[in-house]
Every structure is written in C-alpha cells, then in structure tokens.
C-alpha cells in the first residue's frame, strides 16, 4: 500500500533524475557522521573519522554514501512497496549490524538538507514535503524488522 500521490511521485522522481548519487551520497553520510558523532561507531573500518574534514574527505565514507543513495534509487522505483524493497537491508541492519532505527530517520533528514542545498529553487515546499514523506517511509521500512 502506498501513501504517495501522483504529485509526490512526480516530485520525487523529477528531482532524483538530477541527483549526483556519488556526490550527494558522500555528502549525506559525511554530514550524518559529523552532526551525529555517535553514528561513527558503525564505521570503525573506515579509517580516520577524527574531524569533519577527515570525514568529508574519507573515500570509504563517500563510497558507502553512494551505495546508500543507490539503494534509495531502488526505493524510488518501488515507492508502492518500500517494506518489500528494504526487507533484506532491514534484516541486515537489525540482526547483524544492530543499528538503532532512529539513525535511518536522521540520515533521511540529512539527505533532505543536502538536496535543498544543491537544488535551490527547484526544492519547493511541495518537493520538500514529498521527499520528507519518502525518507520517512524508507526509515520505517528499514526499521520494520525491529518491530
């Protein structure tokens, strides 16, 4: 079941077509790690996360951020089945990685901020509302294994 209107879907897919996954992904994950430093504990293998500049310049942060946004691209193709789309990732993050599901919500909010910064006037209140709905849906789907 989807709670996305045709307008939501159009706003999400239209903006997504303009997103540079590598750049936006690295920036989003980097900002999450800077603003919410406790999230760094999940990335011990990434090397130096000792300062904002170390985090933002870390190639492993950039690569994983791109991977996260690539996964988000799959969600955008499957807005009507976010829970199904993220079933395996929810299981991995819950059972194996023990990630607090609140972190998914935080990451989504950071992504919305990054999109707003990079897309200026195109990032209207309506587009923001649609993206906020989508990242909330993704966070819920990723957290579904926890419930």
Curated annotation (Swiss-Prot):
Key words of the record: Acetylation, Heme, Iron, Metal-binding, Oxygen transport, Phosphoprotein, S-nitrosylation, Transport
Example of a GO cellular component annotation carried by this entry: blood microparticle
Domain Globin: residue ranges: 3-147
PTM annotation (S-nitrosocysteine): residues: 94
Listed InterPro entries: Globin, Globin-like_sf, Globin/Proto, Hemoglobin_b, Hemoglobin_oxygen_transport
Modification Phosphoserine, positions: 45, 51, 53, 140, 144
Family recorded in the similarity comment: Belongs to the globin family.
Annotated protein name in UniProt: Hemoglobin subunit gamma-2
Organism field: Sapajus apella (Brown-capped capuchin)
Gene that encodes it: HBG2
């Amino acid at each position: 079941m989807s709670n996305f209107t045709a307008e939501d879907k159009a706003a999400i897919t239209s903006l997504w077509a303009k997103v540079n996954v590598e750049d936006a992904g690295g920036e989003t994950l980097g900002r999450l790690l800077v603003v919410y430093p406790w999230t760094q504990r999940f990335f011990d293998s990434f090397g130096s996360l000792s300062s904002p500049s170390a985090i933002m310049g870390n190639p492993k942060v950039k690569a994983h951020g791109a991977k996260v946004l690539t996964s988000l691209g799959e969600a955008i193709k499957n807005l009507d089945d976010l829970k199904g789309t993220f079933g395996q990732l929810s299981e991995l993050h819950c059972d194996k990685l023990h990630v607090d599901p609140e972190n998914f919500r935080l990451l989504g909010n950071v992504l919305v901020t990054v999109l707003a910064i990079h897309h200026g006037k195109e990032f209207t209140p309506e587009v923001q509302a649609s993206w906020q709905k989508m990242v909330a849906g993704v966070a819920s789907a990723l957290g579904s294994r926890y419930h």
